[in-house]
Amino acid sequence: MHLAIFVHRVEDVPPGLYLLLRDPDALDRLRAACRPDFLWEAADDALPLWRLAPVDVRSLSARLSCDQNIAADGFFSLGMLADFDASLQTFGPSFYRHLFWETGMVGQVLYLEAEAAGVRGTGIGCFYDDPVHDALGLHAHAFQSLYHFTVGRPVDDARLTTEPGYPWERTER
């Protein structure tokens, strides 16, 4: 699962579109599948992080996430890209669910790391698959966007409450 990262407000990282490559063997295939105008500049010496486009991606990020501002208002948002065709060809169609399990595990790590850093993360369940693929230049099914996530400062919503689950747990206030 590779991460297409839309960086908005990260200290020492210029805004833009990045790709965190989780499998170095996929680099050539991803480069060939993505837009030819991407830079593919190494963005970090310690991570397989590639700067694709040094541009303001806030409005694009929100648009791709069903026009949800949460994708643009945080530090960054990301789309998880599965090595789709190769996985299904190697392991069969039933492997599809394993790809989603992997996105869930990556999401859980992001939740935990965000909390440990004193910020918040949340999954973004609504995103437009085809426009995400178009933004990256992906036109075949080799790589597919399966899940999105964002990290930023928490926004408390007074409409959300926590109530006891059982009547005997309720106390008079």
Per-region residue spans from a language model:
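Acidic, surface-exposed loops and disordered segments
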Residues: 1-173
